[in-house]
């Protein structure tokens, strides 16, 4: 399946289609959008965003705890879309601050 991903960035919103077997960060880059990242392995907070609508599968990541995930935080480098999804990007400071 392919879902619509909307990223709400500091520069404004961007939208693109993302297959459910491609990480959102990877697809965003493929579409020409630059997002923050560091490890690309789900073990840091550089790429953190916050899901405001929809669902993702980020079971490949291990940095976020259950409370952070429950609050909507997502690591875009290990997140597969599970529905049409809206994510606010550049949330590392909100997560770690």
Swiss-Prot record:
InterPro entries: 2Fe-2S_ferredoxin-like_sf, 2Fe-2S_ferredoxin-type, 2Fe2S_fd_BS, Beta-grasp_dom_sf, Fd_pln. GO terms for biological process: electron transport chain; ferredoxin metabolic process. Keywords: 2Fe-2S, Chloroplast, Electron transport, Iron, Iron-sulfur, Metal-binding, Plastid, Transport. Binds 1 [2Fe-2S] cluster. Gene3D superfamilies: 3.10.20.30. It is found in: Plastid, Chloroplast. Its main location: plastid. [2Fe-2S] cluster binds at residues 39, 44, 47, 77. The keyword Endoplasmic reticulum does not apply. Residues 3-93 form the 2Fe-2S ferredoxin-type domain. PROSITE patterns: 2FE2S_FER_1 (PS00197), 2FE2S_FER_2 (PS51085). One of its GO terms (cellular component) is chloroplast stroma. CDD domains: fer2 (cd00207). One of its GO terms (molecular function) is ferrous iron binding. The keyword Plastid applies. Its cofactor is [2Fe-2S] cluster. SUPFAM superfamilies: 2Fe-2S ferredoxin-like (SSF54292). Ferredoxins are iron-sulfur proteins that transfer electrons in a wide variety of metabolic reactions. Belongs to the 2Fe2S plant-type ferredoxin family. This is Ferredoxin. It comes from Lycium chinense (Chinese wolfberry). The lineage of its organism: Eukaryota, Viridiplantae, Streptophyta, Embryophyta, Tracheophyta.
């Amino acid at each position: 399946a392919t879902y619509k991903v909307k990223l709400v960035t500091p520069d404004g919103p961007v939208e693109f289609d993302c297959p459910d077997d491609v990480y959102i960060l990877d697809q965003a880059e493929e579409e020409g959008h630059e997002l923050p990242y560091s490890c690309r392995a789900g073990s840091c907070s550089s790429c953190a965003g916050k899901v405001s609508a929809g669902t993702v599968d980020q079971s490949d990541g291990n940095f976020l705890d259950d409370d952070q995930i429950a609050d909507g935080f997502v690591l875009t480098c290990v997140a597969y879309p599970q529905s049409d999804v809206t994510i606010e990007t550049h949330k590392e400071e909100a997560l770690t601050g």
